[in-house]
Amino acid sequence: MKKENGKELIPLKKMTELCNCFNLNMDYVIGIKREHNGNGKHLLDSKEIGSRLRCLRKKYNITQRQLAELLHTSQSTISAYESGKTIILTAFALQIVYKYHVSLDWLCGRTEDMY
């Protein structure tokens, strides 16, 4: 696990397992929502995450390159996330959640509520 600002980041796969085990939502775990009830058990689907990342990018009219610059990564990494070849890193997912005020549960395909 990486440390950022003195806090350990939980890999999304492990966070999903934790949320499934205790019926929590991810937004509660990262501290952006007070409601803690989860919405059932879910597995991470890299293609769904990629689709939602693309949807978010289109909604805010930004290119893969612009998102890559925001996350301090490469355009090819964003492309790999969007195509579902790779699951997005927790640190990148959190940056997106905080910058665009979207739900981590939505980004990870656990709810249809974007906010």
Model-derived regions, located:
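Short basic helix-loop element that most often maps to the first helix and adjoining turn
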Residues: 17, 51-66, 70, 95
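Short amphipathic recognition helices of helix-turn-helix/homeodomain-type DNA-binding modules
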Residues: 28-37, 106-115
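A short, Lys/Arg-rich alpha-helix, primarily the initiator
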Residues: 36-59
